[in-house]
Design a protein with these regions (language model features):
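Conserved phosphate-donor/acceptor-positioning beta-strand/loop module used by diverse small-molecule
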Residues: 68-88
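Conserved substrate/cofactor phosphate-moiety recognition/catalytic segment
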Residues: 1-44
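Conserved P-loop NTPase nucleotide-binding/switch module
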Residues: 52-53, 61-65
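Helical mechanochemical/support elements of P-loop NTPase systems and associated helical scaffolds
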Residues: 21-29, 57, 84, 99-103, ...
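Small-molecule kinase domains that catalyze NTP-dependent phosphoryl transfer to phosphate-bearing small molecules
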Residues: 90-151
Length: 151
């Protein structure tokens, strides 16, 4: 949604390829990290939903959390490539501009951030959400425990 806002269009509007050039993506991910830092500075929680397939991007979002002294829980959702291709090719409407060509390029990069938890996304949405919530709850508990120990 940040990219669409930067281009002044509604989220359902398909952007041209030039909107996905590396320098534009760099601005998008910097803005996302800046927003995350702002929210964390006010004591809020952040969910940053993006591809994060470039090391600079996932390093930047992790740094936003570490600079604020909060626990970071990064998740890398994976599914069988055939399932992903089917999902993308059947998608109609919505904010995503992804195509099967874009998906193919992303899969070739094989850019899983090393410290992020891999999550099998080839399951029911409820099962994925439950796994993410349990890990997030554990991270929040660890964060509270470390704050109590430090004080």
């Amino acid at each position: 949604r940040i990219r669409k806002a930067m281009h002044g269009v509604p989220v359902e509007t398909k952007l041209p390829d030039r909107a996905y050039r590396p320098e534009v993506s760099d601005r998008v991910y910097r803005e996302m990290a800046w927003r995350a830092d702002l929210i964390l500075s006010e004591g809020g929680s952040v969910v940053a939903d993006a591809v994060f397939d470039r090391p600079a991007d996932h390093d930047r979002i992790e740094k936003a959390a570490s600079d604020r002294g909060v626990t970071f829980a990064g998740f890398w959702l994976e599914a069988d490539p055939l399932v992903l291709w089917q999902r993308v090719s059947e998608r109609r409407g919505g904010p995503s501009d992804a195509t099967v060509d874009i998906l193919s390029r992303q899969l070739q990069r094989n850019a899983t951030p090393p410290a992020w938890r891999k999550v099998d996304a080839d399951r029911k949405l409820a099962d994925i959400a439950a796994e993410l919530a349990s890990v997030s709850d554990a991270a929040a508990f660890a964060q509270r425990a470390s704050l109590k120990t430090a004080s």
